[in-house]
């Protein structure tokens, strides 16, 4: 299945948008470079309960937010700055079935007497376009040890069936630290797991349609996998783990592809190409050299259950591909679209049920391309918001 795309760009003419120069000034560096010191944020384009899309871009000391004016677009508001002093330009983003959006990040505040004070922070948006609840500190798994606290990884957050947040982060000792909410919303003390292997990469959590939390973390010469079968259960080491070899840092993503099943995707550190894996199968190569993580979306295309992928290609442009879900042997074709971008592209369905591919341009501005009203996965011209 070969998606088609138009590479031209149109500018949104929505009233109330910031002037071009102001927009660029506010949105500059909206996403970290794919080869920057932090992994690229994924899953940053979400559809709310009212059908409107929202895009989130972590920047130093805050988050930029764009919101559709009406379901299906094409006009947007933003970028609006959601201040968070000390926040690093990385987020883990999770959405509940009710449309609540949870943002989790790392905050660093310089101290004159030694290492910076580092903590994880959490905020919630309950309705599309509405203000965030205040950022709440979740502390640090190393407590008051600021030297170790500075060396934690980036967080990965998911929601269980009750809507409670489960947070995972690699700690400074090479183990896993974990924190979760109870069903009442109260945060529990830090816990985690200490494998025989030394964890070296970022935690990547996902949940099955049955609510099982499934966690992968790269380690020295291995990939470690844990499962949490129930919201209040302990993390248990999984029986099956991918023989992945070298995973490029910050590239693990996942999509629900069947009852109780997740398909994991990552980029190989050896050749930069995409791999897919499910328990019971070896990793499968999907081609697509490039950088950063792969955006994922499972949706019907012409009546066929398909998994759509998008990533930043070797020339810096967004690339899109699709194949029948869980049929990696069918192959896929990567199609470039638009102009060079920064960070990782994102995929979502809009209020009209169309596939939307979004990316940040090299000035940090938001660009979107929507599926055409015709058979297949052809995209209309890009629009700069």
Task: Mark where each language-model region is.
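A structural motif
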Residues: 2-385
């Amino acid at each position: 299945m070969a998606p088609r795309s138009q590479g031209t760009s149109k500018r949104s003419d929505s009233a109330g948008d910031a002037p071009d120069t102001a927009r660029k000034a506010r949105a500059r560096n909206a996403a970290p470079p794919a080869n920057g010191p932090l992994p690229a944020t994924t899953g940053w384009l979400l559809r709310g309960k009212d059908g409107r899309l929202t895009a989130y871009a972590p920047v130093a000391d805050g988050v930029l937010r764009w919101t559709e004016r009406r379901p299906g677009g094409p006009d947007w508001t933003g970028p609006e700055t959601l201040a968070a002093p000390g926040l690093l330009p990385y987020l883990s983003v999770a959405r509940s079935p009710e449309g609540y959006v949870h943002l989790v990040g790392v905050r660093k505040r310089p101290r004159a007497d030694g290492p910076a004070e580092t903590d994880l922070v959490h905020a919630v948006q309950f309705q599309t376009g509405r203000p965030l609840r205040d950022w709440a500190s979740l502390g640090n798994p190393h407590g008051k040890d600021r030297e170790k606290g500075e060396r934690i990884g980036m967080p990965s957050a998911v929601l269980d069936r009750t809507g409670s947040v489960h947070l995972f982060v690699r700690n400074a000792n090479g183990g896993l630290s974990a924190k979760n909410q109870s069903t009442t919303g109260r945060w529990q003390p830090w816990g985690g797991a200490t494998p025989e292997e030394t964890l070296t990469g970022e935690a990547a959590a996902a949940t099955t349609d049955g609510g099982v939390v499934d966690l992968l973390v790269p380690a020295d010469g291995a990939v470690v996998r844990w499962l949490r079968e129930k919201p209040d259960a302990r993390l248990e080491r999984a029986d099956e783990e991918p023989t992945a070899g070298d995973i490029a840092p910050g590239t693990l993503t996942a999509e629900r592809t069947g009852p109780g099943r997740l398909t994991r995707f990552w980029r190989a550190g050896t050749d930069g190409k995409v791999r897919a894996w499910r328990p019971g199968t070896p990793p499968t190569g999907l081609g697509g050299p490039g950088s950063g993580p792969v955006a994922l979306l499972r949706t019907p295309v012409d009546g066929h259950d398909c998994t759509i992928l998008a990533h930043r290609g070797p020339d810096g442009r967004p690339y899109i591909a699709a194949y029948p879900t869980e049929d990696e042997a069918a192959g896929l074709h990567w199609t470039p679209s638009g102009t060079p971008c920064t960070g990782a592209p994102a995929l979502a369905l809009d209020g009209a049920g169309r596939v939307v591919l979004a990316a940040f341009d090299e000035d940090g501005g938001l660009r979107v391309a929507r599926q055409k009203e015709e058979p297949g996965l052809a995209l209309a011209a890009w629009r700069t918001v």
